[in-house]
């Protein structure tokens, strides 16, 4: 897609720095090169250059890079000027270029370089979003997963499903167009076999994207338990600061407290909640209700108990809690036995009837490293090579596609209607195509790229 305008932006951060970089992209980039450099640099070579103003006086000097279309970031002619990172010099160069006569050039909008790369087929929409995720990464896991998406791992999975859908639909539509010809295989077995293969592919990618979403958006860990078990003390220890008020009075915490922390490279949102108990206090009741809401929306629950209670009560309490949350979609539950300093017992991990217990002391710090390692390892087990970043819109589209597949299978078993099946497969194809950008509205593109920085 060739545009009739040219864009320019500073791609390095504003402010003083050793190097400042300007990027120009569009059909007039060559004229900008002639005006500012006096020539077009050798393609894809770093060329030492002087940057001239309109009166041919030197504004700055540095490196120029020329990438002729279509072999560039955006697929258009691209000129990069790398000079000294003085904001005043950067502004003078930008003004110089914007004031060039007979050239339609303007400041780039946020994410417009990446948007042009997408529109010109240099990257798909998943890769464009991965660039934004990579820039905003705060942990090593997010960096590696973003790079996997940028390198096309996520797109590869989506394209594999789309390819299978097209192959399936082609055979279906062939049977519609040439229904009078004999088909040398059991048609129903063929269709059910394809449903099974597609179902396996969807379940695999649904599992991967749910893990990728956790990496991008941080693991939500909710601390719950009875009053005075040490929930707030645990929050303070994990966050390495006095985030919550701690007293000997039951019910001190009456509202939800949030703290974002990094545990061994894993981004986590730790949530402290009001103690779970029966109470007549209206304010405390509201806090307890919010505690249950947090539990429902958590990725990992840390149920804190006082280790001084009997083993029988520990077991009874844990089993009762698991029954209470049996209908919730919670991935992990860990029972934390606090106040180990009062019993001077083993500090570590134990299992009782498939329930996991970790003994700690929030007061002395005993077992905290073990707990942190447990929390990070559970996530790192899912964060190996091949995992990619997934956004909410990706998960939503995959869920819609999978629901349509299940619906198509149900309708086939009920009606055996080939036209209806072919149309369902076409719908699934379009839903998945919205993830990569093959079928995407301009409003969605605008919303996605508007979150990017101007230089990208």
Curated annotation (Swiss-Prot):
Where in or outside the cell? Cytoplasm
Q: Which GO terms describe its biological process?
A: tRNA methylation; tRNA wobble uridine modification
Residues annotated for Mg(2+) binding in this entry: 232, 253
Main enzyme class? hydrolase
Molecular function GO labels: GTP binding; GTPase activity; metal ion binding
Q: How is the cofactor bound?
A: Binds 1 potassium ion per subunit.
Tell me the keywords, alphabetical order.
Answer: Cytoplasm, GTP-binding, Hydrolase, Magnesium, Metal-binding, Nucleotide-binding, Potassium, tRNA processing
Read off the InterPro entries from this record.
G_TrmE, GTP-bd, GTP-bd_TrmE_N, GTPase_MnmE, MnmE_dom2, MnmE_helical, P-loop_NTPase, Small_GTP-bd
Q: Which residues bind GTP?
A: 228-233, 247-253, 272-275
Per UniProt, (6S)-5-formyl-5,6,7,8-tetrahydrofolate binds at 23, 80, 122, 456
Give GO cellular component annotations, separated by semicolons.
cytosol
Q: Which cofactor does it need?
A: K(+)
EC code: 3.6.-.-
The segment(s) forming the TrmE-type G domain are 218-380
The residues the record assigns to binding K(+) are: 228, 247, 249, 252
Entry's NCBIfam families?
Answer: mnmE_trmE_thdF (TIGR00450), PRK05291.1-3 (NF003661), small_GTP (TIGR00231)
Q: State the function annotated in the UniProt record.
A: Exhibits a very high intrinsic GTPase hydrolysis rate. Involved in the addition of a carboxymethylaminomethyl (cmnm) group at the wobble position (U34) of certain tRNAs, forming tRNA-cmnm(5)s(2)U34.
Its subunit composition reads: Homodimer. Heterotetramer of two MnmE and two MnmG subunits.
Say which family it is in. Answer: Belongs to the TRAFAC class TrmE-Era-EngA-EngB-Septin-like GTPase superfamily. TrmE GTPase family.
Q: What is this protein called?
A: tRNA modification GTPase MnmE
Species per Swiss-Prot/TrEMBL record:
Buchnera aphidicola subsp. Schizaphis graminum (strain Sg)
Organism placement in taxonomy: Bacteria, Pseudomonadati, Pseudomonadota, Gammaproteobacteria, Enterobacterales
The primary gene name is mnmE
């Amino acid at each position: 897609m060739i545009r009739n305008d040219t864009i320019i932006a500073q791609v390095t951060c504003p402010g003083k720095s050793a190097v400042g970089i300007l990027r120009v992209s569009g059909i007039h980039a060559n004229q900008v090169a002639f005006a500012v450099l006096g020539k077009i640099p050798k393609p894809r070579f770093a060329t030492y250059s002087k940057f001239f103003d309109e009166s041919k006086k030197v504004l700055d000097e540095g490196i120029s890079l020329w990438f002729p279309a279509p072999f560039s970031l955006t697929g258009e002619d691209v000129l990069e000027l790398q000079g000294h990172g003085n904001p005043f010099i950067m502004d003078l160069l930008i003004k110089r270029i914007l004031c060039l006569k007979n050239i339609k050039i303007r400041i780039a909008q946020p994410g417009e370089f990446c948007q042009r790369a997408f529109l010109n087929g240099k990257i798909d929409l998943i890769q464009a979003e991965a660039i934004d995720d990579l820039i905003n990464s705060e942990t090593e896991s997010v960096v590696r997963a973003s790079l996997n998406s940028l390198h096309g791992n996520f797109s590869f999975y989506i394209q594999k499903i789309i390819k299978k859908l097209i192959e399936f639909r082609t055979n279906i539509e062939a049977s519609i167009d040439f229904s009078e010809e004999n088909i040398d295989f059991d048609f129903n077995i063929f269709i059910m076999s394809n449903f099974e293969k597609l179902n396996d592919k969807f379940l695999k990618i649904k599992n991967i994207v749910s893990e990728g979403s956790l990496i991008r958006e941080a693991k939500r860990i909710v601390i719950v338990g009875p009053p005075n078990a040490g929930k707030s003390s645990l929050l303070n220890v994990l966050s390495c600061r006095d985030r919550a008020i701690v007293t000997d009075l039951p019910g001190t915490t009456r509202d939800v407290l949030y703290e974002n922390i990094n545990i061994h490279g894993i981004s986590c949102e730790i949530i402290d909640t009001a103690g779970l108990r029966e109470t007549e206090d209206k304010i405390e009741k509201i806090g307890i209700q919010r505690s249950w809401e947090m539990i429902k929306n958590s990725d990992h629950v840390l149920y804190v108990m006082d280790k001084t209670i009997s083993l029988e009560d520990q077991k009874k309490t844990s089993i009762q809690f698991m029954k209470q949350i049996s209908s919730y979609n919670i991935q992990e539950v860990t029972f934390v036995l606090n106040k180990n300093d009062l019993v001077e017992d083993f500090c570590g991990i134990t299992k009782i009837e498939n329930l996991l217990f970790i003994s700690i002391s929030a007061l002395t710090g005993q077992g905290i490293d073990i707990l942190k390692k447990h929390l990070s390892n559970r996530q790192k087990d899912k964060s190996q090579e091949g995992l990619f970043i997934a956004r909410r819109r990706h998960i939503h589209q995959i869920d819609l596609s999978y629901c349509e597949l299940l619906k198509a299978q149900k309708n086939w078993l009920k009606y055996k209607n080939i036209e209806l099946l072919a149309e369902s497969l076409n719908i699934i194809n379009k839903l998945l195509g919205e993830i990569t950008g093959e079928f995407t509205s301009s409003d969605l593109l605008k919303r996605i790229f508007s979150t990017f920085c101007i230089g990208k």
